[in-house]
Design a protein with these regions (language model features):
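Extended basic (Lys/Arg/His-rich) segments that typically form rRNA-contacting surfaces
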Residues: 1-202
């Protein structure tokens, strides 16, 4: 079931470690980006309910007829309670995650280019000795019958640069550093540094 409690757009910063419960825990720091609710989509007009969020509003010259623009416009599925509690033009903040212990994260994974089967599909490979020349090759693609390559067979190809969603990630704390709000989550997150991620309330 999709999350319908809203969310935030953040920027991935760095990984570090924190001392939690008498042990070091690997954590990821993400920075809250300035964002506001542009408008709402409703069942009557659009067939579903969501909040359209604009991230990093750009300063444009209205005298030249330039319209409002954002570096990113996305939307979050919301419920009727979210509609009644928020309005268009409202700036979203980390208080949306007050009392929330776990979140879902969606982002673009790092692109790794064209990779072979050993790295892309995690196959073992072949013997490195006894005169074998094809240690990291794919080998046979199938049997004499059914005379075709079966679906799901590992092959070399493009790896990474895919949308990934990770659920039930522990949200540890919210910090403020140099006027910026940082959120600390346990473990690693998809994407490169400074890439945008979507945090969903679970």
């Amino acid at each position: 079931m999709a999350n319908t409690k809203g969310g935030l757009v953040v920027s991935k910063q760095e990984m570090t470690k924190m001392w939690i419960d008498d042990k070091f825990v690997a954590v990821t720091l993400v920075k809250l980006l300035p964002q506001e609710i542009v408008r709402f989509k409703t069942n009557e007009k659009d067939g579903y309910v969501s909040a359209v969020v604009g991230v990093e509003k750009k300063e444009l010259n209205k005298d030249k007829g330039q319209k409002v623009d954002y570096s990113m416009v996305t939307e979050f599925l919301v419920d009727e309670n979210f509609l009644s509690a928020h309005q268009a033009g409202e700036v979203l903040d980390t208080n949306l995650f007050d009392g929330v212990s776990t979140i879902s994260v969606t982002g673009q994974s790092k692109g790794k280019g064209f990779q072979g089967m050993v790295k892309r599909c995690n196959i073992k490979g072949w013997s490195a000795t006894h005169g074998h020349k094809f240690t990291r090759s794919g080998g046979s693609k199938g049997n004499r019958k059914p005379r075709r390559t079966m679906k799901g067979h590992p092959h070399a190809g493009h790896m990474g640069s895919e949308q990934k969603t990770i659920k039930r990630i522990p949200l540890l704390k919210v910090l403020e550093r140099e006027g910026e709000k940082l959120m600390v989550v346990k473990g690693s997150l998809p994407g490169a540094r400074n890439s945008k991620l979507k945090f969903f309330v679970e």
